[in-house]
């Protein structure tokens, strides 16, 4: 049974899964409004894994960097997707798809195409620590296309900065 004080994802009304669509609409005017209305020439998204509202809210006044966002930008509390895992959220930002569409729910899962447990973000078998060692083409089991490619088709240049 789900505890009554659990917070459920608000898909379509304030969930992490709504972030890509919100950015798409703000930059291109295409699609539904999303989390925040308005059109913009530039949008900057800082995606800091595991730094949710319960960490941000009590620190926002203490750190100038966070306070700047509060005063000069847009800060909004949203719900996590389900499951609330790095794999699901990173894949959502890369593809624009929630877990139910991308198929990436967890850090590790059984993949029938290779008949083993894989680590999709590392593209490796469960017992391997070597990135890219999975012996199947990603196109066979992962979503194709990226959120950034969709933006490019709409004439929007986008950039991603992340660890290699």
Predicted regions and their residues:
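Active-site nucleophile/metal-coordination loop of metallo-enzymes that catalyze phosphate/sulfate
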Residues: 1-43, 50-145
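Feature for exported/extracytoplasmic and membrane-associated proteins, marking the mature portion
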Residues: 139-164
């Amino acid at each position: 049974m789900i505890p009554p004080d659990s917070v459920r994802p608000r898909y379509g009304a304030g969930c992490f899964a709504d972030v890509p669509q919100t950015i798409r609409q703000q930059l291109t005017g295409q699609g539904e409004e999303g989390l925040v209305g308005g059109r913009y020439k530039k949008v900057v998204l800082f995606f800091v894994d595991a730094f949710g509202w319960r960490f941000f809210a009590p620190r926002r006044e203490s750190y100038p960097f966070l306070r700047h966002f509060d005063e000069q930008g847009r800060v909004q509390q949203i719900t996590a997707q389900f499951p609330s895992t790095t794999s699901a959220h990173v894949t959502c930002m890369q593809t624009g798809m929630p877990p139910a569409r991308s198929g990436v729910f967890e850090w590790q899962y059984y993949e029938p195409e290779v008949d083993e447990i894989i680590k999709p973000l590392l593209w490796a078998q469960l017992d391997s620590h070597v990135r890219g060692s999975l012996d199947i083409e990603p196109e066979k089991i992962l979503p194709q296309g990226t959120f950034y490619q969709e933006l490019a088709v709409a004439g929007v240049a986008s950039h991603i900065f992340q660890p290699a």
